[in-house]
Amino acid sequence: MTESESMVYRVVPKCACSSIGQIMFYSDHGRYFDGDIHDATSGLHKWNQPESQPLIEANVAAHKALTFTCVRNPYARILSSFFDKICGIQRNGRRYRGNLVPMLVQKYGIEVGGPDGKQPFDQIASFRRFLLFARDTIRWRRPMEPDIHWSAVSGHVATFIVNGGRYDQILFTEKFDEGMQKVLDAAPT
């Protein structure tokens, strides 16, 4: 939620959340956050900040602000998850979730381009193996619970409704500019 409480956004991982966070930050402060918006500890109200939770709850209960979320084609979302979270090196210089990638290499035969992610590898074969892993996590909760980056979008979106929220807008990453413009046009700031 913006500090001005003009917009409430339900985050859905791998659905333009960084871009949306930066736009919301800009709408209140006239500048973008210097760094990764996920690392911001001020300038936005976030659910993971205990002091923000009562403000978000009250705003959502009274439906005081424009409330929106963003969804994405499931194939594009899981492909993005694969390249970002499995093949990529994270902001901290390490692999995502520590031992997850080594386990995928061992149990599923996934290749990720070597320790630095820069070596050539069969991306199609590895992605197909990753899909088997993602299916196993979703269907059987093995070898782990589904990760937020590839669990169903509907689960993320529905938690807001179940907890009393109501969306004014749902935009699509595939039509991001158009959808975000509608959100900004409808928001008071």
Predicted regions and their residues:
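Membrane-interface amphipathic segments in extracytoplasmic regions
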Residues: M1-T189
